[in-house]
Amino acid sequence: MAEPRGIISAMLTPFTSDVGPVDYEWLPGYLRFLADGGLHGVLALGTTGEGPSMSVAERIRTLEIIMAHRGELSVIAGTGCAALTDTIALSRAAIDLGVDAILVMPPFYIKQPDETGILAYFRALCDALPADARVMLYHIPQVTGVPITRTIIDGLLASHGTQFYGLKDSSGDWEHSKMLIDSYPQLRIFTGSDRLIARALAGGAAGAITALSSAFPKLARAVFDAFHQGGDVAAAQARLSAVRDLVNPINTPPALKAALTWTSDLPETALRLPLLPLSNEEVAALRAAYERIMAGTTP
């Protein structure tokens, strides 16, 4: 298995229409685009990839295509589902396909669950997987409503330390990410924030798994290269953060799928309901603002 590290795209999932199937034929070209953009790996079926809007069967087939066309990219599979049985089935399938790690969000429908129950959920998952499985937990409480607390982390390390591989922190809180990096050197900690890539690299993170790299891979890779090659890290991060500021007022997958129409040669791809595409006016405004940033004319 490859070692996930560096800049990893929270890759998009293509659909033929808002109620249609996955556009599997679109995926190989997209993976080439991400690799050509200098990325080290991909996270499939995550938040940006609309994974929770897909069936288990669709997700498995998507992973089959990705693994067949991954090239040198590492692959992390988002396998968290509301039902533990689905999470186990999808995780087993992903591991059988040879993914380098799985990323699992906590069960998100039952509100205010006890930490003991969440820990038991993750332990049951690990018990159902091979001993050498690499399990990453997904901390994105603003979406799931369920934080990955230190009690959960400590408990899973105590019981399944050989399988517990890492954590993606998408809280956007650098102090929280730094605490994880400093407190758990045995875990690979990834930031999920485009704005925190430079800080994460300087602070000892394994890398960054971010949304913008799914449509702007070269901008994200530029931060990595500047950090490792003695370049202007602040300038590279500022440019990426400025693009993030454009996307923030808009729902992320619609903005990124729109952006792909001018950052790549890929055909336009659809979103799955309940997500809606941007209007023509919104797309034009987004592109114009992006071009001003790239030209260095944005105040």
UniProtKB/Swiss-Prot annotation:
SUPFAM superfamilies xref list: Aldolase
EC number assigned by the record: 4.-.-.-
GO molecular function ontology, one term from the record: 4-hydroxy-tetrahydrodipicolinate synthase activity
Subcellular location: Cytoplasm
GO CC annotations, alphabetized: cytoplasm
Claim: DNA repair is one of the keywords in the record: no
Active site per database record: 47 (charge relay system), 109 (charge relay system), 138 (proton donor), 168 (schiff-base intermediate with substrate)
Self-association state and partner proteins as the record states: Homotetramer.
Protein name per its UniProtKB record: Uncharacterized DapA-like lyase Caur_1967
Lineage, opening ranks: Bacteria, Bacillati, Chloroflexota, Chloroflexia, Chloroflexales
